């Protein structure tokens, strides 16, 4: 047998051996996809469930910036866990826990809470004590109108309908989508990704008190439509309803 023939046989044998140990369609050692309820890595869980609203890396989007140090200073783990598990009624924040109709296990919720907490830092606080996450007393909408003029009108306009540097915050569609708690968080922590100041920065050297935050939130809440999403009374709607049968 010639050397060429022997070499050919060896090559064929090697190829046959490799083919037997690596059958077509056989997954590699690192190619298996975990079932959704077994994914525990924070970055994956956040990207799949949170980033769409709260931004990549918690930078903010339609929802508030979860990486904001002020938010993490006032929202403890139980607050974050409850909102993640059960959602926030009356807002676009859904429930993620399986026990509340979502897709995540309790352990996955814990992984998200721990991951978010790892973002906490004292950066930007400078030993300041922000108002608490939850209001201590009910807000006074009438006084809130005065608070608004003092702290907010320079950006959002005298009536809240928008100014030179900020949009309307009394838009009925907007107020229908956010809760009082969301408004409170926004007043306290601001929206740094949008250039909105926190509770200390509206008037340098004069931070808002807890009661002032509660009062301005009450004033904003008083501007909500009673039945969001329904036709609002105006002359055009009245004329239409007068001449059409509407079931």
Question: Which residues are covered by each model-predicted region?
Answer:
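Gly/Gly-Pro-rich "capping" loops immediately C-terminal to redox-active cysteine motifs
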Residues: 32-39, 43, 55, 59-86, ...
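Basic side chains
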Residues: 3, 81, 117, 184, ...
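Disulfide-stabilized extracellular ectodomain repeats and their linkers
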Residues: 47-50, 63, 90, 149, ...
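C-terminal motif of bacterial Sec signal peptides marking the signal peptidase cleavage site
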Residues: 17-19
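Short alpha-helix boundary/capping elements
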Residues: 88-89, 120, 191
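Flexible coil segments in periplasmic/lumen-exposed cytochrome c-class electron-transfer proteins
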Residues: 24-32, 36, 40, 44-47, ...
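Bacterial N-terminal signal peptides that target proteins for export
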Residues: 1-9
């Amino acid at each position: 047998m010639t050397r060429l023939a022997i070499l050919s046989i060896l090559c064929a044998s090697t190829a046959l051996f490799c083919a037997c140990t690596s059958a077509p369609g056989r997954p590699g050692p690192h190619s298996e996809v975990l079932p959704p309820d077994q994914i525990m890595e924070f970055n994956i869980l956040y990207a799949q469930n949170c980033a769409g609203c709260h931004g990549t890396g918690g930078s903010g989007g339609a929802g508030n910036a979860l990486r904001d140090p002020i938010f993490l200073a006032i929202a403890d783990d139980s607050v974050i866990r409850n909102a993640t598990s059960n959602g926030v009624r009356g807002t676009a924040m859904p429930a993620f826990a399986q026990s509340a109709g979502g897709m995540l296990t309790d352990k996955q919720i814990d992984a998200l809470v721990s991951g978010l907490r790892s973002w906490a830092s004292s950066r930007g606080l400078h030993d300041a004590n922000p108002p608490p996450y939850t209001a201590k007393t009910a807000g006074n909408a009438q006084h809130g109108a005065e608070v608004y003029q003092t702290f907010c009108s320079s950006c959002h306009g005298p009536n809240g309908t928008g100014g030179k540097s900020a949009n309307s915050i009394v838009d009925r569609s907007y107020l229908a989508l956010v809760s009082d708690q969301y408004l409170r968080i926004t007043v306290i922590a601001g929206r740094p990704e949008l250039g909105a100041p926190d509770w200390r920065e509206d008037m340098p050297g004069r931070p808002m008190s807890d009661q002032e935050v509660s009062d301005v939130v009450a004033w904003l809440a008083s501007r909500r439509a009673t039945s969001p999403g329904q036709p609002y009374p105006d002359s055009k709607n009245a004329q239409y309803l007068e001449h059409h049968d509407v079931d």
